């Protein structure tokens, strides 16, 4: 119970997990077991099966040495079966590169096919005032379609949708951009700053980035291209997802334009999203690790705020400390 309490209160960030000593009775039972089999005890497998090493040793108390060895054999079998098998597993997902429509999902409509118009943001309502009139857009803002529109309109902020939800275990996040457009809009004076963002900033809706709903990998690459396109005009990209795998292409795109290590990231999340042992490289639990590993953001310029719940555990906090990353648990936030 104390371990769970420490985690829920955020105290695991400040204390190392105590190592459970191996009981002498267990040492006696394994003294004749081959060393290569005992290596499984150093893996996460015992804790995965029984929660803690203390519980594991407790479960072994009534077993004979032969039964203990059989239990270790079972854990080894599970560990081996969990690994990649080149004889039975696919290392990559095959694609039909002969398909004439391979890139049709992200092929742009040539401007020559559109009615000729002067570049710049397009207002989609016929009315001067009122909210929720005309076609729904982010923040009730005018629409921009091409980079030329951003440049001609001297746009400060381009809000763009990224309806991707395949980097998560659950579906539905792809409806985020649609839901945000259906909200009342944005406007009025913020009471904390006495500033009306819609008046002091030129804001546009830049549409949704195309997503291949059959491939997270292809989609994320295209998101990176489109976010980079916005940033190259000098406009600030404001991305509405979508699941959290999108953090990686968003951050990488800014590094493409401004240079690796030239900016920082403030990451508000209950989890640190720096997992590194999962089968898929592009998920909602790994964008921070990839952004740091590939050098897009220096770890000391990554700030985590709001960490709570069961993840990260001791290894995650150790990784952040070793890399100089700053973090603030939700317990700290509530105190302040």
Predicted ranges, named:
Residues 11-15:
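Sec/Tat signal peptide C-region and signal peptidase I cleavage site
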């Amino acid at each position: 119970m104390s371990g769970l309490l420490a985690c829920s209160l955020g105290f695991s960030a400040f204390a190392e997990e105590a190592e459970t000593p191996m009981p002498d009775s267990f040492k006696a039972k394994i003294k004749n077991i081959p060393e290569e089999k005992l290596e499984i005890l150093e893996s996460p497998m015992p804790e995965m099966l029984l929660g803690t090493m203390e519980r594991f040793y407790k479960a072994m108390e009534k077993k004979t040495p032969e039964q203990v060895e059989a239990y270790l054999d079972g854990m080894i079998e599970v560990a081996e079966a969990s690994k990649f098998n080149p004889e039975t597993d696919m290392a990559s997902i095959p694609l039909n590169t002969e398909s004439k429509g391979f890139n049709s999902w992200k092929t742009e409509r040539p401007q020559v096919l559109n009615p000729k118009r002067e570049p710049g943001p397009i207002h989609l309502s016929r009315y001067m005032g009122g909210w929720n009139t005309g076609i729904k857009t982010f923040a009730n803002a005018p629409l921009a379609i091409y980079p030329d529109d951003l440049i001609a309109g001297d746009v400060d902020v381009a809000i763009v949708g990224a309806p991707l939800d395949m980097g998560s275990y659950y579906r539905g996040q792809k409806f985020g951009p649609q839901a945000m457009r259906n909200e009342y809009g944005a406007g009025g004076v913020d009471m904390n700053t006495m500033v009306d963002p819609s008046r002091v900033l030129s804001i546009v809706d830049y549409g949704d980035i195309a997503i291949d709903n059959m491939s997270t990998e292809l989609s994320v690459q295209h998101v990176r291209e489109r976010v980079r396109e916005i940033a190259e005009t000098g406009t600030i990209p404001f991305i509405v997802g979508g699941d959290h795998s999108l953090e990686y292409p968003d951050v990488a795109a800014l590094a493409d334009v401004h240079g690796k290590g030239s900016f920082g990231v403030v990451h508000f999340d209950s989890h640190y999203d720096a997992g590194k042992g999962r089968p898929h490289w592009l998920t909602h639990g790994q964008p921070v690790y990839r952004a740091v590993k590939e050098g897009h953001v220096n770890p000391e310029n990554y700030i985590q705020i709001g960490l709570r719940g069961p993840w990260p555990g001791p290894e995650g906090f150790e990784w952040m400390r070793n890399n100089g990353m700053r973090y603030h648990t939700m317990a700290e936030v509530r105190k302040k």
